[in-house]
A protein has these predicted regions:
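Extreme N-terminal starter segment of soluble prokaryotic enzymes
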Residues: 1-4
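Catalytic-core segments of thiol-dependent peptidases
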Residues: 7-126, 209-216
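Active-site-proximal C-terminal subdomain of hydrolase catalytic domains
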Residues: 113-217
């Protein structure tokens, strides 16, 4: 498998979000998958640039790494976008998201899976995340030819990799499905994601959705 990891390149203001979370977690992700024999490219986006330039940097990295099977993004996020320049908050932003999806589809394999290690990208005003950034990103990729793509996202704000508010978006779905909806499953999911020796935070985004739901109902 070929992975591409994308992060920002600096802390935001006085926060230690990059050096304290996004950078070390992206390094751990790459180390894990390389230990399994996978190829992993890592790129950093210059956050001093405007949104369109950030997206252009991501596209350059995607084309350089092609063909990719796995895309992992470590950054801030919200219900309608991510820190690295992509948004779904307006018609023009959705057009840009569609253009990004087309380029990603051309530079990826049919096995493409995406992990959004970003806050809130799977959340919306609808309980199943319909209309969220992750949902719109998946639909844009489907329109671009990646009909089987799945996207891992978080419903609410939390740690970039240890947030147990997980929502998965996949083929044939309207919106997404939540993991850990029972108390026992949520506690187990939370414990595993917080355990430094447990690889679940790297493997969960790429499990078949039915398998993930069966393990963490």
């Amino acid at each position: 498998m070929k992975h591409l990891v994308i992060t920002g390149d600096r802390n935001t203001g006085t926060d230690h979000d990059f050096t304290g979370a996004f950078e070390p977690e992206s390094v751990r992700y790459a180390k894990h998958w390389r230990s399994k024999g996978d190829a992993v490219d890592v790129t950093r986006v210059d956050l001093s640039k405007h949104d369109r330039e950030r997206v252009a940097q991501m596209l350059t990295a995607i084309r350089t790494a092609a063909p990719i099977d796995r895309l992992a993004i470590f950054s801030h996020g919200w219900q309608t976008g991510i820190q690295l320049g992509l948004s779904s908050s307006s018609s023009s932003a959705r057009d840009e998201l569609a253009a990004f999806a087309t380029a990603l589809a051309c530079a990826s394999t049919p096995e493409l899976r995406i992990a959004l290690y970003c806050c809130s990208t799977g959340g919306s005003d609808v309980p199943n995340g319909l209309g969220s950034f992750a949902d719109r990103m998946r639909l844009a990729l489907v329109a671009a030819g990646r009909r089987d793509v799945t996207i891992f996202a978080h419903r609410v704000a939390g740690h970039t990799t240890r947030n147990a508010a997980v929502r998965l978006f996949g083929p044939g779905m309207t919106g997404g499905v939540d993991l850990g909806t029972t108390r026992e499953a949520r506690q187990r999911l939370d414990a595993q994601l917080h355990a430094g020796s447990d690889p679940l935070r790297w493997t969960l985004p790429y499990l078949p959705i039915d398998e993930a739901r069966a393990a963490y109902p």
